[in-house]
Amino acid sequence: MLEKYKLKNGATVLLDHVDGVRSASIGLWFRAGSRDETPQEAGAAHFIEHMLFKGTASLSSAELAGRMDDIGAEANAFTSRDCTNYYMRVLDKRMPEAAELLADMLFNSRFDEGDMSTERGVIL
């Protein structure tokens, strides 16, 4: 059964438990997609999506990828017209670590000039 909670900060949390399933997914959805961008900002949401995988204040991109591998995470993100989503799928016992990594990516990402230059060529 789907459970829905509203946090004090306005975020909505949805939980769905499926008996007998040992995998768990965490996804963070943001109402920020291409339709929210002006012509001068075109590609910004997609650019930021890529940059969040380029490392954090405490983890290089290689270390971040290594930590994801260590916990067996399938991690990805996408940007659509309406939203941007970051997600990981792991074994249920690894969910705390997956949530910690996603939080680190969202709150502590490094926007390294070299990485930004590379991603500008890919995205913009």
Go through each PLM region and give its residues:
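M16/MPP (pitrilysin/insulinase) zinc-metallopeptidase core fold and M16-derived inactive scaffolds
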Residues: G20, S25-R89
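Charge-rich, well-structured scaffold segments of protease-associated domains
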Residues: K6, H17, S61-L124
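N- or domain-start disorder-to-order transition segments that initiate the globular core
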Residues: M1-S23
